[in-house]
Amino acid sequence: MINDLIRYCYEQGWSNTIYQSIVMIAFVVQMIFLIFYRKKYGMTLMQSIIAVLIIYPAAYFLMLVLAWVENGFQNWGANNIVRVYVYTPLICIVAAKVLKKSSGKMIDYIAPSMALQQVIGHSVCPIAGCCQGYPCSWGIWNPVTETRVFPNQWLECIVALIIVRYLLHLAKKENYAGTGKVYALFLITFGSTRFLLEFLRDNEKLLLGISGLALHALFMVIVGTAWMMVLNEKEKQKAIQKRKNTNPNGKVKK
């Protein structure tokens, strides 16, 4: 039934329209999520809307630029938002300065929505025929290759959904402190899983079966790990300082 639906949409010339529509819906869902999530980080409705209007257009533009550079300045194709996840915190810092909010809170506030975009956006990739897996006899029909392929896009959706749930749990556990830890762990969890999932994609490999997007994912893991090391060291130093400022009776020195 699913294969028949994909084939029918392709034959009617609807594939790209449906894909673009779902991508836009994903953006709207992200915005709605952030509007409801804003109170956790002490943001007003207007601040939330302004933050979204600063961060997402800037991230999209950066995505186009990075794709253009990777394509040898030839075209703007092969766009994928994964390219900008490492750099999004820098855009968040700018948004935080504009809104006079904590940079750490702004960064952690945005983190779950990054993974949420993957949940929705990838769900419709099979209709467009992009991000496809390798040929598979029991797979879904791909309108580009006109063969059945492994439905890795939906596997990526499931993994991204698990990451969203994990980030929300982590943020709550941290009492929405806005230390940057949530985004750092987003980079690690999403980057590591995406690196592995890239091996299921039937795309161009650069070296040892590793694709360009897999390298971006690996870079995410490296940056996220370094980020967590810095945060853990800061927490360690704070704990040491707190012990120094407390006398043996447990009272804070004045």
Q: Where are the regions that the model predicts?
A:
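Hydrophobic, membrane-interfacing alpha helices
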Residues: 1-254
